[in-house]
UniProtKB/Swiss-Prot annotation:
May act as a carbohydrate transporter. Gene3D superfamilies: Cupredoxins - blue copper proteins (2.60.40.420). Induction: During nodulation in legume roots after Rhizobium infection, and after release of bacteria from the infection thread. This is Early nodulin-55-2. Glycans are attached at N78, N116, N134. Its main location: membrane. Belongs to the early nodulin-like (ENODL) family.
């Protein structure tokens, strides 16, 4: 029996590493699902709200805002500034580089608006709900509260669901897991 322990230990370490990697995958989301989606005019005033509601954002995920830096910017602020499209909020973080990457580091709502107030008022704003990455699968499958859509969305029908992975890139550990499984077979 004692001779089994040395062989079991590497197996358990590799199994633990595989489980850790598969549960800690972070996603990168291009806001709006495509290049230059952070621009005005939008295809529909509530298109960014619908896009955000079709995804589950977790701690560690990254939002990528792609926009024309000469004409647009991204402001991160609070809910009040988001609702009122206040572009001069006291606690705003302003991004204006054209390719802004924002890592989601804690659970809760994050609010982003255009630096151009009239663009924001026409729907160029985004609220996302970030969930803790240690939620159970049951919690991930249950509906979550959604950010307040612009008033025009109350009158328009809901669009059909977006296809999976629209605007999403995964930093998957699938290749690493395959290598680890191959190594386990060699042992």
């Amino acid at each position: 029996m004692a001779s089994c322990l040395p062989n079991a230990s590497p197996f358990l370490v590799m199994l633990a590493m595989c489980l850790l990697i598969s549960t800690s995958e972070a996603e990168k989301y291009v806001v709006g699902g495509s290049e230059k989606s952070w621009k005005f005019p939008l295809s529909k005033p509530d298109s960014l709200s619908h896009w955000a509601n079709s995804h589950r954002f977790k701690i560690g995920d990254t939002l990528i805002f792609k926009y024309e830096k000469r004409t647009e910017s991204v402001h991160e602020g609070n809910e009040t500034d988001y609702e009122g499209c206040n572009t001069v909020g006291k606690y705003h973080i302003v991004f204006n580089g054209g390719n802004t990457k924002v890592m989601l580091t804690k659970p809760g709502f994050r609010h982003f608006i255009s630096g151009n107030q009239s663009h924001c008022q026409m729907g160029l704003k985004l609220a996302v709900l970030v969930i803790s990455s240690n939620k159970t699968k049951k919690n991930l499958l249950s509906p979550s509260p959604s950010p307040s859509p612009p008033p025009s969305s109350l009158l328009s029908p809901s669009p059909s669901p977006l296809p999976n992975n629209q605007g999403v890139t995964s930093s998957s550990g699938a290749g690493f897991i395959g290598v680890m499984m191959w190594l386990m077979l060699l042992l």
